[in-house]
């Protein structure tokens, strides 16, 4: 697990490097599918002092199997998503400014241009609000459930992120670093959408044929973007 702990540590350290977190407002995890174990950031530990050995290993029920700290308070959300989506290898949660602003507004981040379409096939959805019973019950678990409810039958790697109403963004990917990459993109396109709509409030969505081309040339069965 040491290699995975190092990867998760490095991915967590990327959050402040890319300006996605303030103080300790974020967490990254990754899963070892063969062992059924998840490595995640410890709760409330400052990035300035955090080490790879501080990462916490939990099983799929959330029981700590390795580590001296308590795992992130969002662990149950991560675990619920891993259980539902076998294609996920890493998950990240932040309170990055612009993506969180869309979450607080209760709005999906609209697909307005090709930067968005290179990574997200359509709008980045916003969940419904959690009920009082859901919040007072198993809050973090129910956060995972409302993400799954919102995604429905969508392929999660075609929509590698979401904003949770009145809370903030979650992103995911094939591994921890891919998840952070998608979180960075989400923050950037959230900022772009806010600026674009400020310039032109009547702005609608990117043309569907242009969105299809940009997404499929990177992620489709006949993708040709980048190097083999």
From Swiss-Prot:
Gene3D superfamilies in the record: Class II aldolase/adducin N-terminal domain
Q: Where does Zn(2+) bind?
A: 74, 93, 95, 167
**Top EC class, one word:** isomerase
A single GO molecular function term of this UniProt record: zinc ion binding
Q: Which residues bind substrate?
A: 26-27, 43-44, 72-73
* Function as written in the Swiss-Prot or TrEMBL entry: Catalyzes the isomerization of L-ribulose 5-phosphate to D-xylulose 5-phosphate. Is involved in the anaerobic L-ascorbate utilization.
Q: Which UniProt keywords apply?
A: Carbohydrate metabolism, Isomerase, Metal-binding, Zinc
Q: What induces it?
A: Induced by L-ascorbate. Repressed by UlaR.
Q: Which organism is it from?
A: Shigella dysenteriae serotype 1 (strain Sd197)
One GO biological process term: L-ascorbic acid catabolic process
Q: Where is the active site?
A: 118, 225
According to its UniProt record, the EC number is 5.1.3.4
The record's section on InterPro entries has: Aldolase_class_II_sugar_metab (IPR050197), Aldolase_II/adducin_N (IPR001303), Aldolase_II/adducin_N_sf (IPR036409), UlaF (IPR023499)
The entry assigns this protein to a family as follows: Belongs to the aldolase class II family. AraD/FucA subfamily.
What does the cofactor field's note say?
Binds 1 zinc ion per subunit.
According to UniProt, the name of this protein is L-ribulose-5-phosphate 4-epimerase UlaF
* Reaction catalysed by this enzyme: L-ribulose 5-phosphate = D-xylulose 5-phosphate
One annotated Gene Ontology cellular component of this protein: cytosol
Question: Which cofactors, if any, are listed as required?
Answer: Zn(2+)
| Pathway it works in | Cofactor degradation; L-ascorbate degradation; D-xylulose 5-phosphate from L-ascorbate: step 4/4
